[in-house]
Amino acid sequence: MPTKIAVLGAGSWGTVLANLLTENGHEVDLWSHNPDQVALMKRTHQNEHYLGAEFTLQPALHVTADLGQALDQAAVILFVVPTNAIRSVAEQVKPILQAHKGRGEQPIIVHAAKGLERGSELRISQVLAEVLPKELIQGIVVISGPSHAEDVATHDITTLTAASDDLKLAEKVQKLFMNDYFRLYTNTDVIGVEIGAALKNVIAIGAGALHGLGYGDNTKAALMTRGLAEISRVGVKLGAEPLTFIGLSGVGDLIVTCTSVHSRNWRAGNALGQGEKLPDVLKNMGMVVEGVSTTKVAHQMARELDVDMPITDAIYQVLYENAPIRTVITDLMKRSGKPEFDFDNASLQKP
């Protein structure tokens, strides 16, 4: 039975997910806030700016700049916009859902964002829950894991996690996406999935910088492993399940983001390692680099939670204090010795 789905955000990931859901037989509206982009996509049946000329939109996929049209009778609303746009888009969605109230079952809200809101330090599901009251929606599901849009576009095998406080909702979303190249597992640890998704972008900037500086595999492996320790520490302090961080949304997403040229965060770090300045890097990228803003949020969270995050702090110094990368690397290596696993540290224990 086809499901009516609204995908909000026509960047690379939103477009690919909308295409996949259409392939799976669902009725999908892909919304963009940019009418010119919509007109071009309708004319060319492509999203060349984000995905190149080889990627073709499914004929049945409907692209629109009319948010009300996209949301009309939608059983599922999938947010695939940058973290800094989540709240504003949700605020546009809210009055439309209020007008639709009583016309049928409330929609399931799904998001695929990988970041934290600046200022509030909220996870994305928290932002959505703050804007969209319970009486307007069934609940919230997050999908996350090791995934680049470019690979999914060519039907490379990909596995993600669908996480929700309500397992039945996660299972419903799981069924929508599953096919012979795209597989979802379910999880109820929303905190862990969202923290892993957001903070791995910070570590990926560091991994890219190491590559740009010419460091080898040993160094990169050390950064990723100790970076995962930092992500786990802050996640567990916030109430996440430790096992989540060795799953798809933890170590899985960390690996793909820290090793792939498709990763915007890795590419940004690589450019910094080669000597480019951050404003120039962001301008040349032409797309959102979530890890830059997330670094600032994570730096503040570490202090508020009293969690040791030396790698995150080092990346913060490079991005926001113009510290030389080689200097912060030396400072990291000169820290006093400590055990690899500090199980007596309160930040490693679930509250």
UniProtKB/Swiss-Prot annotation:
Superkingdom field: Bacteria
Protein name (Swiss-Prot/TrEMBL): Glycerol-3-phosphate dehydrogenase [NAD(P)+]
Cellular compartments annotated: Cytoplasm
Keyword field: Cytoplasm, Lipid biosynthesis, Lipid metabolism, NAD, NADP, Nucleotide-binding, Oxidoreductase, Phospholipid biosynthesis, Phospholipid metabolism
Organism lineage: Bacteria, Bacillati, Bacillota, Bacilli, Lactobacillales
GO CC terms, sorted: cytosol
EC code: 1.1.1.94
Family membership: Belongs to the NAD-dependent glycerol-3-phosphate dehydrogenase family.
